[in-house]
Amino acid sequence: MSEKTSSLKLIPVMLAFFAMGFVDLVGIASNYLKADLGLSDSEANIFPSLVFFWFLIFSVPTGMLMNRIGRKKTVLLSLIVTFLSLMIPIFDDAYMVMLISFSLLGIGNALMQTSLNPLLSNIVSGDKLASSLTFGQFVKAIASFLAPYIAMWGATQAIPSMELGWRVLFPVYMVIAVIAILLLGATTIHETKEEGRPSTFGECL
C-alpha cells in the first residue's frame, strides 16, 4: 500500500476518532439538562454513569462481534449507533429520551473503542502505527475540547442554533458522524484474517 493511499484511508478513520470524542459531551450536557429539567444531583449524575455502564456491558461482546463481521463493519456499526444517539435529542430533551440517547452514545462508544484501534492497524503498521494512534487520540481530544464551547455558543445564540439552544451541539456532531459513515463506507480496507475460530462469550470470561 502506497503512502498516499494510506494517508487517504486515514481520513475516515481519524473522523471516527473524532466521533469517539463525542462521548465527552455527556458531562456538559448533564449540567444543561440539570438546569433545564430541574433535576437533582443524583438524577443528573446518571447520565455520565450510563457511558461507563454500557462500556462494561458491551466491551467483551464487541470483541466477539468484531471477530465475526470484521473491524470496518464494527466501526461502521458504532458510527451508526452514535448517529442515532445524536439525532434523538434534536426532537426532544425529556429525561427518559435523554437516558435513551446517552445509552446509545455509550454503546456506540464501546463498539468504537474496541474496534477502531485494530482497524487502524490494518492501514498503518510499525513505527507509523504508534504515531497514528497518538494523532488519533489528539483528534479525539479536539472533539472533547469543542463540545462545551459549541453548547455555550448555542445557549447564548452566538451561533445559529435552530432554536435548539445548547442542543445545537447534537446536530453539529451528527453531521460529522454522517460524513465519517459515508467516507469509511466508501473506503476499501484490507483486513488481516484472525487465525482460529472466534472466541465464545464463556471463553472470554
Regions found by a protein language model. Give the residues of each.
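Extracytoplasmic
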Residues: 8-41, 117
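Flexible cytoplasmic inter-helical loops of multi-pass small-molecule transporters
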Residues: 185-204
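Cytoplasmic helix-loop-helix junction between adjacent transmembrane helices
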Residues: 101-138
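Conserved MFS/SLC helix-loop-helix module at the cytosolic interface between two early adjacent transmembrane helices
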Residues: 57-96
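Helix-loop-helix hairpin linking two adjacent transmembrane segments in secondary transporters
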Residues: 127, 131-188
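Short hydrophobic/aromatic, small-residue-rich stretches within specific transmembrane helices
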Residues: 13, 17, 45-52
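Residue-level signature of mid-helix packing/kink "hotspots" within the transmembrane helices
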Residues: 24, 52-60, 145
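MFS-fold secondary transporters
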Residues: 85-89, 105, 184
